[in-house]
Every structure is written in C-alpha cells, then in structure tokens.
Amino acid sequence: MFNKFDTKPLWEVSKTLSSVAQGLEPADMVIINSRLINVCTREVIENTDVAISCGRIALVGDAKHCIGENTEVIDAKGQYIAPGFLDGHIHVESSMLSVSEYARSVVPHGTVGIYMDPHEICNVLGLNGVRYMIEDGKGTPLKNMVTTPSCVPAVPGFEDTGAAVGPEDVRETMKWDEIVGLGEMMNFPGILYSTDHAHGVVGETLKASKTVTGHYSLPETGKGLNGYIASGVRCCHESTRAEDALAKMRLGMYAMFREGSAWHDLKEVSKAITENKVDSRFAVLISDDTHPHTLLKDGHLDHIIKRAIEEGIEPLTAIQMVTINCAQCFQMDHELGSITPGKCADIVFIEDLKDVKITKVIIDGNLVAKGGLLTTSIAKYDYPEDAMNSMHIKNKITPDSFNIMAPNKEKITARVIEIIPERVGTYERHVELNVKDDKVQCDPSKDVLKAVVFERHHETGTAGYGFVKGFGIKRGAMAATVAHDAHNLLVIGTNDEDMALAANTLIECGGGMVAVQDGKVLGLVPLPIAGLMSNKPLEEMAEMVEKLDSAWKEIGCDIVSPFMTMALIPLACLPELRLTNRGLVDCNKFEFVSLFVEE
C-alpha cells in the first residue's frame, strides 16, 4: 500500500479533506488565479483555484469558501500550474551527486519525484548500497521512489561485481516501504530463454503487486518483444527508433522516451507520436543518466519537456508524459500525477509553456523552491566507511599490466569495439594491428586504442583486454570506475605509461574519472562514494566535469559526453561487442569471443 511518500496517508485525512472542500474547515493553503493544466483531460482551465490541506489537494475550482484566517494564499497571477514532474527512470549515481545534492539540484526545476534504480551502487556494495541511498534521500523533500536492482550482475557469468542479487533478495526488498518495483530487467535473454533467475526476480515483484521495469534494447518488435512483455514487464526506456517505441505502446508497454546527457533519443522516438498521430497515454519522458554540468546548464525534466515540444509534441501532451502517464505506469496515479482532489499536493508553477520556466514548486503542500532556488533545508548524510573504501585491486598496476601478447607475429587482426556517438550500441570491427616484441600495438592513426578492465571488488586479479575505436584520441589515456554495470576499473589509451598513471590516480583517490597525457593529469573527477558519487555540491562537480570534458577535447576527443560513452564499453547486455574483466563478449550471441580473429 502506497503511503511512504506522503505527509499523511489519505485514510487518515479523508474527513478533513472532505470538510475543507465543502468549506466546513479552512484550508492550509489556497492557490488562486491559476491556469490549471488538467492532465486528466488534456486541457487548460482558466482562473482556477486549488485548496490544499494536510499535504493533499482538497478542492479544484472556486476555493473562496476554503480560505480561513490562517490560510496561506498564493496568487498565481495567471501562471500555469501543473502536477509536479516525475522522472520514471533515473540512475542518481550517473549524476555523480549524492541523493541529497541531487534533490537540491532538480527540485527547483519542477521535479517532485523520481523512480530511482540504484543498480550502479548495488553492483559495488550490494543491497547495503541501496539502503545508503534510501537513507540519504530521507532528508530531502524529493520523493525518492526506489526500484530493486534486478540484474546484479547485469549478465551473470560474464563479469565480476561487488555483489549479487537473487529472487530471495528481491522478495525481501519488496517489504521495504521505499521500494515500488523492480529495476530495469536488462537480462532479456534470461526472460526469453526462461531462466529461473530472471523469472524469479520478476515473479517476486509481481507477487508483491509492484511494477517491473524493463530494458529491451533489441531492434525486434515481434515474438521476442511479445514474450518479454508477457512475462510482466511494464515499461522500457531503450527505444532508439520510432518504430520500436510505437510497437511497445501498441502492446500496452509504457515506452519511455530518453533524453539524458549522452543519449539523445527524443529526436527520433518522438516521431512515434508526431508522425503516427497515436494516443500518447503509454509514453513517458525520462532522463536515465544525467551529468552534473547538464543539470546545472539545462535543468532536468523541465528541459526534457522543452525538448519534446521542440520535436513537435504538444506542450500539454509533454506534461502528461512526466506526470499522469508516469504515475499510471507505476500504478500510483491514485496518489500522484494530477491536480485532483485527494492527490498529493505536488504542484509546479510555469511562467510559459514554450520555455517551461518554473517559478515555484510545492511538494506535499509546502513551498520548497522559488525562483530556481530551494527554499527548504536538506539534511546532510554521511556515507559509511565501506562506501568510501571500494577500490580493491589485487596487483600493482604498471605499464606492463597493459601488455597484449601475440608471440611470433608481425601483424594480427583484432576484434575492435567501435562506439557510436550519442548511442548506446557498438559495432564489431576487424582491424589489422602491428605486433612489436610480441606485443600487440594500438594504432591511433586508425583511431584504435587499447582497453583494459581490471576487477576492483574482490581482489581477484582478473583483467580483460581489448581495443576500442571511435574516440579520436591521438595521445593519452583515460580511466574510470564508472564502468557499467559492474563498475570495475576501465582504462583506455594510446600508451601503457599514461594508462598506468590514469589507473593509479583513481586507485589513490578512491575512484572516479581521469584524463592523462604525457605523464600529466589533465582532468580528474574524484568519486569516493563507491567509486561512483561525490558529496561535493553540484556547482563544484559541474566545474570538475567541465574541466574533464575539456581535457578529453585537448587529447583529441570531441564527441558528446565521452566519459558516458566510455562507461558503456563493459556493459555486456547491450549489442554488439563489449569488454568486461573476464574478456571480450559477443552480446548478440552472449558468448565470449577471442580478441583475435582466426585466419
């Protein structure tokens, strides 16, 4: 039963709300002179009042009779009011911010609730990491609704993570007040091949009558997609083509249109609505992964709504996609997602619908943001020691740690991972490389860099070796512990010396992201919380990330959010070719393949 994210549950205040609506008791707050965006009927209702009591909406209409001596009256002065915005799929860890700092960053932009999938920290710290993020969020006004990570590891047997989550763990977490469903079921092969583990975690969620969120990245809309949805998966954010999003909506699956820092899918997938003229009730706008400099520069869901409008989606439709549609997806529309009697009093004031400029934000009947700034305090949370000490590398990393051997060869053909800028997929390419002193050489002239993934959770000493293409770097190295989803230590570069320096720099600072050239650190973002997040403020983090972005450009890479693209190199649930600490993975066949192509 949903009652964790309200000031008071409806059954405790139903008499009061009914009395306030009838003028028998005064409201706590009344908003007057607003232009109500009614997401239930997709219309603007002029000159509308809203009466609020006990953190909930008591009346929508003429509320003069609800105003008492101590009622707080807010004059909207003709501004639009809309339900508070909900992000249906977000990994807070990708912001590199703590949950409390993330809340401070997004609430002034109209975001009142997030459906957080903390599978990044869970891969490092297990369910303890999930608990830490829940505790961090409790001191904020933001409604932090959590989905239990479903795929830890993302694809069992192909990588080493800090923890594992099974059906029995999911069953236990479904009892937690903050858990509203299951995080993205990335192991779609497990669903389609009917593995006990995949169907077990889905089944435990369905038994609890909670929402199973999805991740179906295959460009297939027939029997596979049908089988995936039939298992109980309710939504998916992995559509990159309009036809994929349309097919999912037609099958009753909520298609989540993604617009984050690195993945700009909205331009294409919005055509599912604009070109096909279909009902948009099964469409939701989400961010998935957003970096600090993006939050600081562009905002959050307000920016994504604006982008949707720019792509031809009607403003009221776009607002439905971050309010009632999202609430219905998570079976919470009886509590969230609309400005209607009985619902949580989560309301945003919008100056105009073209620029989606947010002027005020109310959560649970309290004014929490005004003029782009938070007006309420947020409690600081200190992460425990195990979260701050997550770098467990067995062997000392030296330049020799990056040797890729091919004895008695002068040249060899290697499988190379080619990235696709601003997309999550990769291509498998075959490239001939030189061998010197039995060591395979990368080739920056062909845009081919060396890549190594070191296990960092259990001191196993394992490492996977490969090559990547598409970054455009001529000299230098990059390293990151943000390396989805196992978050081992990933290093790419043109020479072993810079690669060793990059790796050891992150080991010393507890994890993060770094760019190195000619023995010099050009940009560093320390992420001491599980090697994923920092307790620094947004502005400071944005500055460090911007400096790192500049460092990438300095060494020759000009793609958008290159560190996010780099972070997906080890993610073995996405096509086509990936590298984990155990080796090179063909993600179409889900099998390990040799680094070298057999002649």
Swiss-Prot record:
UniProt KW Manganese keyword: yes
Cofactor: Mn(2+)
Molecular function terms, GO-annotated: adenine deaminase activity
E.C. number: 3.5.4.2
Database matches in Gene3D superfamilies: Metal-dependent hydrolases, Urease, subunit C, domain 1
Catalytic reactions of this protein: adenine + H2O + H(+) = hypoxanthine + NH4(+)
UniProt keyword Hydrolase present: yes
EC primary class: hydrolase
Top-level taxon of the source organism: Bacteria
Keywords tagged on the record: Hydrolase, Manganese
A GO BP annotation: adenine catabolic process
Family membership noted in the UniProt record: Belongs to the metallo-dependent hydrolases superfamily. Adenine deaminase family.
Designated name of the protein: Adenine deaminase
Species classification: Bacteria, Bacillati, Bacillota, Clostridia, Eubacteriales
Protein's gene: ade
